[in-house]
A protein has these predicted regions:
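Glycine-rich loop motifs involved in handling phospho/adenylate chemistry
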Residues: 259-268, 293-294, 340-343, 368, ...
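Short, flexible loop segments at the rims of nucleotide/cofactor-binding pockets, characterized by
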Residues: 334-339
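Adenosyl-5′-phosphate
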Residues: 1-4, 8, 23, 41, ...
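Active-site adenylate/phosphate-handling loop in enzymes that bind or generate adenylated species
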Residues: 141, 347-405, 482, 487, ...
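Short secondary-structure boundary/capping segments
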Residues: 330-332, 373-380, 627-628
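Acceptor-binding helix/loop patch of EC 2.4 sugar-transfer enzymes
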Residues: 162, 381, 534-535
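Residues that scaffold the ATP/ADP-binding catalytic core of kinase and kinase-like folds
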Residues: 87, 168, 368-371, 514
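Cysteine-centered catalytic environments shared across enzyme families
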Residues: 1-333, 345, 349, 539, ...
Length: 648
């Protein structure tokens, strides 16, 4: 895993400033602590930070073709690089390394921008074509690896993280009111937007081409849900799922450095580890982390799976100094991000890095296999709509009349909404919903965001799905929104914070293409989520794991806010700086904090959002050059004592 950064000036007579390129690249040094490299030519500058995984001796970047006219910087892994390399050699290409990076260089020579169709993996890369003066940026199909860009006067800047772009003086630190509204609705800012005006996320499965002063984007892949009604038997689907899982895991075990897996004891990570056992001639290293807090420790479940499968199991209990960690999290995410599971993700990544350089995880199992509660609720609501017909809307109107504190009122309200809006609303549950935002915002800020709809992205994705099955549509929405901008963003930043490469076998694009063809009835059956995944895991792990209810990857933030985070929260929310931003109603902020501290109500998610927002403001907006100044602090994260071994 690595970090990339660069600048392209359309005018070849306008050179890229080397010191600026070095600063952009150094901003992501945590992503690649092993080596750094640069390429500068007429109007182009490419920078790279390397975390060595494959071809340790000769895989440094930037890396070019035979005559140097093509240059590549690359973050990620091409898992089928050996297969593509063999094809390219047959076409007459000559290789001087064994790295997957060189496959990109020669692949571009052979197929141009369509080379991405050949690649199987997680990637974000830049290709410079010196002869054509063309820059190509590409991001993998699911958005596992991040890539940001900004058009600036006379050129384009890009990088693995926003902080690289902020090192360029032509990139303004101007925040967007609509993006802030989206954050308070969802916990994150959906692609292609960022909190910064002019900075964009390159969407997954997209290529960007910059040449002759023009920039164009094109999409090269999408998930195609078909409804899965092709007459095949359940056993046929089960057999094919087994084959896809076996291949996806085997491909991700290719490494020249120590490799293991993060294990929670849930269905997804247990599935990955079970197939790792099949693919390895020695017990795989597995790591689990729990908290010293009742109800937030999954180590016992993980140990049950690990012992049953014969793994080399390592369990640690985190004793987080969360008040010291949160400013570092704000720095690593670059923009407001409030999924509190970033905290346990950071600690499990840190624990894993003590033992391995590459860790496989179970991320992706929920989105395409109906693993979330909202999938079951969506399925129930659709059945009720079908059974009640017009009466469903009457039930919905009743829900509108009831306060949300009344049990079941929210589900009744959803019955009155169109299915696309009902599912979009599920993503905002527990955060600042429209009524809550109306109370939270100042009158001036309310006017600024009037007419903006943070949920439009979800409705658009709902209708873009090729299947009419409501459950298929809801899973497609999750795969194109929440999974990319929340789950994968969290995993990438927290693993890269400690220079750990995370790999997600359940997000293999061929496995996902298969999942999209599986009937929804084999994902959610008799009220049981992930039905087919559970079946493939049956007889591999104890029944207690198969039948275990999903618990999520949570942290005890309600108690942290009343305990170790209370002084910081009090200062961040009430010292006047937040009030002076003119965004919020000060009395509403005070009410939320007072009610939570006194246990009158639980506002943990909303308060967490406000805390992370204010930390971001202070790091990236209030302090000129703040992103760079925080580098040393973030670098110290690796030295913090955060976990103690329980067993090994």
């Amino acid at each position: 895993m690595c970090g990339i950064a660069g600048r392209f000036n359309f005018d070849a007579a306008h050179p890229v400033d080397r010191a600026q390129l070095v600063a952009m690249t150094d901003a992501v040094a945590h992503r690649g602590p092993d080596a750094g490299g640069y390429f500068l030519d007429a109007g182009i500058g490419l920078g790279h930070r390397r975390l060595s995984i494959i071809d340790l001796a000769t895989g440094d970047q930037p890396l070019g073709n035979e005559d140097g006219s093509i240059q590549v910087i690359f973050n990620g892994e091409i898992y089928n690089f050996a297969e593509v390399r063999h094809e390219l050699i047959a076409h007459g290409h000559r290789f001087r390394t064994n790295s997957d990076t060189e496959v990109i260089a020669h692949g571009y020579e052979q197929w141009g921008e369509h080379c991405v169709d050949r690649f199987r993996g997680m990637f974000a890369f830049a290709v410079w074509d010196g002869r054509a003066r063309r820059l190509m940026l590409a991001r993998d199909r699911l958005g596992v690896k991040p890539l940001y860009y900004a058009e600036v006067p006379g050129g384009l800047v890009f990088g693995s993280e926003i902080k690289s772009l902020l090192e360029d003086p032509q990139v303004p630190r101007e925040w967007r009111a609509d993006a802030l509204d989206a954050y308070l609705t969802l916990l994150y800012i959906p692609a292609p937007d960022t909190i910064y005006r002019g900075i964009h996320k390159l969407p997954p499965a997209h290529v960007l081409i910059a040449e002759r002063g023009q920039v164009r984007l094109s999409k090269y892949w999408d998930l195609e849900f078909t409804g899965g009604h092709d007459g095949r038997s359940e056993e046929d689907y089960l057999e094919e799922l087994d084959a896809h899982l076996r291949e996806a895991v085997q491909l991700r075990m290719i490494s020249d450095v120590p490799l293991g897996a993060v294990l929670s004891g849930g269905i997804d990570s247990s599935t990955v580890v079970a197939y790792m056992v099949d693919a390895s001639d020695k017990p795989p290293v597995t790591i689990s982390v729990g908290f010293e807090h009742q109800g937030f420790d999954e180590v016992a479940h993980a140990e049950t799976v690990a012992r049953h499968l014969g793994c080399d199991f390592h369990a640690l209990t985190a004793s987080p100094r969360v008040e010291e960690l949160l400013p570092k999290l704000a720095w690593h995410f670059d923009e407001p991000f409030a999924d509190s599971s970033a905290v346990p993700t950071y600690y499990v990544s840190k624990a894993a890095r003590q033992l391995v350089t590459v860790a496989l995880s179970g991320d992706g199992g929920d989105e395409l296999w109906a693993g979330y509660t909202r999938h079951r609720v969506e399925h129930w609501e659709q059945r009720v709509r079908g059974a009640l017909g017009p009466a469903a809307r009457a039930a919905g109107w009743l829900g509108q009349a009831l306060p949300l504190s009344v049990k079941g009122a929210r589900s009744l309200r959803h019955l009155a909404a169109n299915p696309d809006q009902a599912y979009a609303l599920k993503h905002a549950y527990g955060m600042f919903e429209p009524d809550a935002k109306s109370q939270l915002y100042s009158g001036d800020f309310r006017r600024q965001v009037n007419g903006y709809d943070a949920l439009a992205t979800f409705r658009d994705a709902y209708h873009a799905c090729g299947s009419n099955d409501p459950l298929d549509r809801s899973m497609y929405v999750d795969a194109r929104t929440y999974m990319i901008d929340d789950v994968l963003t969290k995993v990438d930043r927290m693993s890269m914070a400690v220079s750990l490469e995370a790999r997600e076998p359940l997000l293999d694009h061929r496995l996902l293409e298969f999942a999209a063809r599986v009937p929804a009835s084999l994902k959610l059956k008799d009220g049981q989520s992930k039905y087919l995944l559970r079946r493939v895991l049956d007889k591999r792990v104890p029944r207690s794991i198969i039948e275990r209810k999903k618990s999520g990857f949570a942290a005890p933030i309600a108690d942290w806010l009343r305990g170790p985070l209370a002084p910081m929260t009090n200062e961040l929310l009430l010292d006047g700086r937040l009030r002076n931003r003119g965004i919020f109603n000060d009395r509403e902020i005070t009410r939320l904090w007072r009610e939570h501290r006194s246990r009158q109500a639980d506002h943990e998610h909303r308060l967490w959002q406000l805390v992370m927002l204010e930390l971001w403001f202070r790091e990236f907006i209030d302090r000129p050059g703040g992103a760079g100044q925080q580098t040393a602090l973030a670098g110290r994260a690796a030295a913090d004592p955060v976990a103690a071994p329980m067993s090994a």
